[in-house]
From Swiss-Prot:
This is Casparian strip membrane protein 3. The keyword Membrane applies. It comes from Oryza sativa subsp. indica (Rice). GO terms for biological process: cell wall organization. InterPro entries: CASP/CASPL, CASP_dom, CASPL. Residues 46-72, 127-159 are extracellular. It comes from the Eukaryota. Homodimer and heterodimers. It holds the Pfam family CASP_dom. One of its GO terms (cellular component) is plasma membrane. The lineage of its organism: Eukaryota, Viridiplantae, Streptophyta, Embryophyta, Tracheophyta.
């Protein structure tokens, strides 16, 4: 009977190692997805501008992301998160090779949570501005600008998608790292 218990324990060890390796590979893939989301959001927002043509050459109306500090914060936040994710890739690849690395997973959980907070702050603040651009605010006499600056509004609205997707991916990365640590 003892021999069968020992055999059962040894047969679970390779399975556990395989699951840990699968979690580590999924971690690398999700980091690539988050990089694409945050980088695309930062680029889309950072290159957004629109000038309205009028009859005279002296009067021009222009909308740029840099006109609003909140959208500038969005670009900076997504750029920082994207840079962090790129720099964390080698550490994530180390987890594929050495799935027993405990302290580096703790470091990744800590920084992933910090980056989740940063991207959430940037995306939430930008979402409020995008809402105001589309709807305006009658009480404050802020008019909606999206009827005039339609291309500008489409791009700033679209850039939010990648950022919110990166938020979901960062939550998944934190859960994956926590699961990998709990299995130890």
């Amino acid at each position: 009977m003892e021999g069968s218990e020992e055999h059962g324990e040894t047969s679970k060890a390779p399975l556990s190692r395989g699951v840990s390796k699968g979690v580590s590979i999924l971690d690398v893939i999700l980091r690539f997805v988050a990089i694409i989301g945050t980088l695309a959001s930062a680029i889309a927002m950072g290159t957004t501008n629109q000038t309205l043509p009028f009859f005279t050459q002296f009067i021009r109306f222009k909308a740029q992301y840099s006109d609003l500090p909140t959208l500038t914060f969005f670009v900076v936040a997504n750029s920082i998160v994207s840079a962090y994710l790129i720099l964390s890739l080698p550490l994530s690849i180390v987890h594929v090779i050495r799935s027993r690395a405990k302290y580096s997973r703790l470091i990744l959980i800590f920084f992933d949570a910090a980056m989740l907070a940063l991207v959430t702050a940037g995306a939430s603040a930008a979402a409020a501005i995008v809402y105001l651009a589309h709807k305006g605010n009658a009480r404050a006499n802020w008019l909606a600008i999206c009827q005039q600056f339609d291309s500008f509004c489409e791009r700033i609205s679209g850039s939010l998608i990648g950022s919110f997707a990166a938020m979901v991916v960062l939550v998944l990365l934190i859960f994956l790292s926590a699961i990998a640590l709990a299995r130890r």
